[in-house]
Amino acid sequence: MDMIEHKQVRDLKLKKNSQSDYTQIYIGLDFGTAFTKASYEIASQKHNISSVKFHDTEATDKYFMPSKLYFDDETKTLSMEKTSGALSEIKYFKYTMIDNSLAINENLYKYKDEVKNNLEQLCAMFFLSRVILKIKKAVTENPIIKNSKINSEVEWFINMGVPILETGEKSEIYKTVLTVAYQYAMKHPQGINANLVELDNFFEEKQGRCKS
């Protein structure tokens, strides 16, 4: 399994001080077929790796985010949660996003002519955007960050393991999806739902910049 990296500097102010520099955060993202896990390290705290807790529970599965979404056929909306029995489950997009022959989410494909981009990539982009927000929340709530005495911008490095070679078209798909997911998270930091067409428009706008 190879790694792809996304790097982005965000203006996240911590404590007011005359000093200003960067706090570097290294994120390890395991985008799994069934579950997603994440951990991070603050560069100034070497060998102190923290796992991201995705759920407010003491159960052992609090570190595992199910890699699935739910789709509302009527509103064409993706959701992180199943809010009604009418929503269909969307899963396995980690692999189907790079190979159309593996596509199994039939409810999505009724709308393939209404979007310009691969439907499974849109699912992965939205899912990863919500995961990134949960990771960033965990980082900013870390006492080391909260109690920092510097006025710092946070420089984020995300390493995501993918089941492909580091180079090639499929690697570029994962890189683009991860990068656009980060951008979408910053643009839309609230909510667990997203309209499929709106996601498509955002992805269409941003992916060209990723490739340029």
Describe the function of each predicted region:
Residues 1-15, 41-58:
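Von Willebrand factor
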Residues 2-24, 190-212:
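Conserved phosphate-binding catalytic cores of ATP/NTP-utilizing and phosphoryl-transfer enzymes
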Residues 31-34, 41, 74, 163-165, ...:
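An acidic- and aromatic-residue-enriched active-site/binding cleft used to recognize and process polar
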Residues 44-172:
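Phosphate-binding loop and its immediate beta->loop->alpha context
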Residues 15-47, 87, 212:
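Gly/Thr-rich phosphate-binding beta-strand-loop-beta motif of the actin/hexokinase/Hsp70
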Residues 37, 132, 175-179:
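Short, well-ordered alpha-helical packing segments
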Residues 154, 166-211:
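Glycine-rich phosphate-binding loop and adjoining helix at the ATP-binding site
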